[in-house]
Each structure stands twice: as C-alpha cells, then as structure tokens.
Amino acid sequence: VAIDFEVIGDSEEGADRVNVLLAASRLETVDNVVSSIELGGLNAKIVDIEAFVIENTIELISGDFPVGISKDAIAVADIGYSATNFSVMENMKMIYSREETFGGLQLTEEIQRKYGLTLEEAELAKINGGLPADYEQEILEPFKGNLASQIGRALQFFYASSQISSVDILVLAGGCSSISGVAELIESRLGVKTIIANPFANMALAPKVNAESLAKHAPAMMIACGLALRGSH
C-alpha cells in the first residue's frame, strides 16, 4: 500500500490535536501510473489523487461560473474513457468522491456493435465523424440519456450519504462532456445548473497554440491542468 499524509491545521477537538489528511492507494495502482509515464520517456516525481487535482482546477474556473450561482456545493462529473469520477466540493473543499464504471468506452462499443467495426475503428469514427445517418438517433441520443441517468444516480448516492440535499452547480469534464447537447440534457433531467469545464478560458495562449483545438479538448484536460497547478496556491 502507498501511503502519504499532510497536516492541514489545528483540530477543534483540542489544542494537542491536529487534522491530518491521509491518502492511501494500492501500490499496484501507483506502479501502473508510473509505468505508463515511463513508457512515454518521462519520470514521475509525484502521483496525486484525482479528487484533489480536480479541486485545484475548480478553484481556477469557479470565477467563470454564471452570475448568481452559489459556490457552496459544487458537483463535478469527470467523464473518462472507461469510468466517470463523480465528486462534490463544499466551500471549495472536496468532501465526496465516487467512481462509476461508465464512460466513453460504452459509446465506442455501441458503435462497434452497430456497424461491425473493430474497437479502434469505432473509436476513430466517434472522434472524426463520418458515421451513418442513423448514428445520432440510434446510438448517440440513447448514450446521452444513459449518461444523464448515471450522473443522476451518482448524485442521489451522494445525497443519501450526506446532510447536503442539493448542489448549486454541476461541472462536466472529460471527453464526453463535449458531446453536443449533453450539458443541456443533464441540466433538464436533473434540475441542476450544468456547465462544461474550460480550465484554459482565462489563460494567455502562446502564438503556436491552436486556440480552437485547445478549446475543443479543454474539458478533457481538467486533470492535466490540476496537476500543473499543484503547489501554485
């Protein structure tokens, strides 16, 4: 088991006590991350926890929340390839995190099944387009509805385990959050203001950076951006 800790302040339970944040993970999980980085020719100095990385990024983008939206309770759904990380922040501090085994892979597999493609071909078709005319109605719309249901279920799990009965805003991140209309559908289904994350919205870009391409992929860069912000505040 990989374990780390940090003293985060005095405890209300007494002058001789402090609050300590303890993080633990299976060593195998950490080793897999490190091995992936090394395959890319890099060396890992720090392995962070996704929930805390997201916390860094939410602090960055919270200034862009719609006017009048409270920041007391913020939900985040980071929709990855094979899993969705659902987390909730209270007063800008992470208080809840849960992983759901649902993500973009489910959409890719449906494309593969429907059109007789390999998984790689289906993934490329999902990204680049060119699928048959019935794709949106037969595959994409049901996937969007299923995604909304998964996030709604995750939200109900949180409410059942917390004294908080509602969140003020839901932030969508990850590649699937860029699917046209998904934020609007989720907001309509759940009755919670829903936005798509763009951690680069207020950053100055170097001339060589393709601003359009960066904006397109920005929601999928939440984790990378949060890692880059580590230690900056």
Residue locations for each model-derived region?
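Glycine-rich phosphate-binding loop plus the immediately following alpha-helix
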Residues: 27-56, 62, 93-133
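Adenine-nucleotide phosphate-binding core of ATP-dependent small-molecule kinases
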Residues: 109, 113-114, 122-169, 176, ...
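Glycine-rich phosphate-binding/hydrolytic loop that grips phosphoryl groups
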Residues: 53-56, 177, 195-233
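Gly/Thr-rich phosphate-binding beta-strand-loop-beta motif of the actin/hexokinase/Hsp70
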Residues: 16, 64-96, 103-106, 111-114
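Extended, charge-rich low-complexity interaction segments
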Residues: 30-32, 72, 76-90, 215-233
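Active-site neighborhood for divalent-cation/phosphate handling
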Residues: 1-62, 169, 199-205, 220-223
